[in-house]
């Protein structure tokens, strides 16, 4: 049985570079402590729509108060992946959403998130082709190297589904 979750892909152009914002999970999280994940993720509560859930998770996890019209649907994906050290598997139906916030968004991470990291889109894409570390920047501009094994957001079907939408969203002439 699949449980329903939402994923927010926060796209940005920072100093002209197209990329994605990833959250670093808090070190006390039961799954993937200290790992890097999509900017906001979480379970969809009973009776809650996927869109309402992703807006709630963005507020709770990274302090962004987004409007529904700032979201682009990225589709839904069935995913199964190991639960890390706790064992077993997660079986999810993930509803993906994309948003574009240029520059450095006004993140205010909650207790589940340590901080935010910007990774160029081509660097993130390369993570699917090999195990090289990802070079990025923290919101304060300092350089950051994310070991490949610290990524917990690599879901092939979802990436294949949202990649072209991200490229369109990040095109220089796009404003959404």
What is each PLM-predicted segment?
Residues 11-13, 100:
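A generic structural motif
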Residues 65-75:
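A short coil-to-beta-strand element that immediately follows conserved catalytic motifs
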Residues 59-67, 102-103:
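Alpha-helix capping at helix-to-loop junctions
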Residues 1-9, 16-56, 60, 131:
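Conserved Nudix-box catalytic region and its N-terminal flanking loop in Nudix hydrolases
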Residues 34, 40, 75-84, 88-176:
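Nudix hydrolase/Nudix homology domain
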Residues 48, 52, 71, 87-91:
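Short, amphipathic alpha-helical segments
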